[in-house]
């Protein structure tokens, strides 16, 4: 009997191709047109998106991207490529492809790349440690659309999330310990996760529970008292309520209350990107210090660290 050949598809959100208003506009249009991201009535949303949001936000967001852009592209793309290459080296007999929900390389190009390698089975690993319908759900939807157009469909194993995976928690804990050793132990470790509208959670998205799971497991691995670890949510968009407490408002409050030293980690981001390097490491640092805080450090994402790559290898091994 012929042995099954397995390929791995690493999936992430995506990024503009360049830090220009035109490239950012193309990316935001695709991203904000996904009903998994914004489920507002199209009759109301299309005029607002095309007539107001894209013209106004694209130039401003392009400047933010330019402030963090790297020689090889956006940070998310650079680190995602490093993850793909490192995992391929770790698993030399297994094809590894990278696909993005929005922008390029697309999920479809990643699937085609694996099919060109004659794989019979694809393990899909969305690089979102905590499930949400707006991220992991978007990968699932697009994958289904892609495969619906194929005459032959490979076997699919879809990893929902890894919020409490032992290797993931240990990698986070070791990263925190290294930061504490370098900068000193802070008064508070703040874990900032990307937010979603509160309505999504009310309708059944278990994302906040998965974030709480990671927070609890990480605090336990570090042996930190509950009052020394706080969970917040960042990057809200629009006017409706999002998951709370909000990261920026919390940092302002903590600075005003006299908390002197904070370190911030974003466990939900598999790779550093605009939201971590600009929003958290820069904007929110200014918020905290401007409110009276004394010392603020951002703990980088796991990116392509050996521990994280080993976690990926172990995670997909159960499905190969």
UniProtKB/Swiss-Prot annotation:
Cross-referenced InterPro entries: Ferrochelatase (IPR001015), Ferrochelatase_AS (IPR019772), Ferrochelatase_C (IPR033644), Ferrochelatase_N (IPR033659)
Record EC number? 4.98.1.1
Keywords of the record, alphabetical order, are: Cytoplasm, Heme biosynthesis, Iron, Lyase, Metal-binding, Porphyrin biosynthesis
Which pathway does the database say it acts in?
Porphyrin-containing compound metabolism; protoheme biosynthesis; protoheme from protoporphyrin-IX: step 1/1
**Pfam families referenced in this protein's UniProt entry, alphabetically:** Ferrochelatase
- Could you tell me the superkingdom of the organism this chain comes from? Bacteria
An example Gene Ontology molecular-function term: ferrochelatase activity
Binding residues for Fe cation, per the UniProt record?
194, 275
Top-level EC class as recorded in UniProt: lyase
Catalytic reaction equation(s):
heme b + 2 H(+) = protoporphyrin IX + Fe(2+)
Gene Ontology cellular-component terms listed: cytoplasm
| Localisation per UniProt entry | Cytoplasm
**Please, one GO biological process term?**
heme biosynthetic process
- What is this protein for, i.e. what is its function? Catalyzes the ferrous insertion into protoporphyrin IX.
Q: What is this protein called?
A: Ferrochelatase
Lineage of this protein's species? Bacteria, Pseudomonadati, Pseudomonadota, Gammaproteobacteria, Enterobacterales
